[in-house]
Design a protein with these regions (language model features):
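Loop/turn-to-beta-strand initiation segments
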Residues: 41-42, 67, 103-107, 129-135
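Conserved AAA+/SF3 P-loop NTPase catalytic/coupling segment centered on the Walker-B
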Residues: 103-128
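Pre-Walker A (pre-P-loop) alpha-helix and adjacent loop at the N terminus of AAA/AAA+ ATPase modules
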Residues: 6-51
Length: 136
């Protein structure tokens, strides 16, 4: 019988092997990203355009079976686009919550520096506290 630690190592090696079929030459990045995901942490990837950051995020979500969302940040992205918002359902007369992009297992925030400070704060709150405030 395998010990839990050996099982985690074997599964991690299998995951990395699957990812290497899609992402070539980024072994260190794959390893650190997998470690961050397993630790329920966050990772900041900085690189020039076109080197596969989005492809890597999609590959991780598929290999690990995680839900995935991506937002291309611009100055017109609102905090409610990230956290969600309530809208009136005119047929029932009730308010319904529409989930924002951050409600997923793996979220890619592309060009976060272009967002307004309020939008950045909404995302950072969700990251730090693992929850967020949304008006209902």
């Amino acid at each position: 019988m395998e010990t839990p630690k050996l099982s985690i190592v074997a599964n991690s090696q299998n995951i990395l092997q699957q990812l290497r079929k899609v992402i070539v030459g980024k072994d260190s990045t794959l390893l650190w990203t997998l470690a961050a995901i397993l630790a329920k942490g966050h990772i900041l990837l900085e690189d020039i355009p076109g080197v596969g950051k989005t492809t890597m995020a999609v590959a991780f979500s598929k290999v690990l079976g995680l839900s995935y969302n991506r937002v291309q940040f611009t100055p017109d992205v609102l905090p409610s686009d990230i956290t969600g918002y309530s809208v009136l359902n005119q047929t029932t007369g009730n308010m319904e919550y529409k989930a924002g992009a951050v409600l997923c297992n793996l979220f890619l925030a592309d060009e976060l520096n272009r967002a307004t400070s309020r939008t950045q704060s909404a995302l950072l709150e969700a990251m730090e506290e693992n929850n967020f405030s949304a008006l209902r």
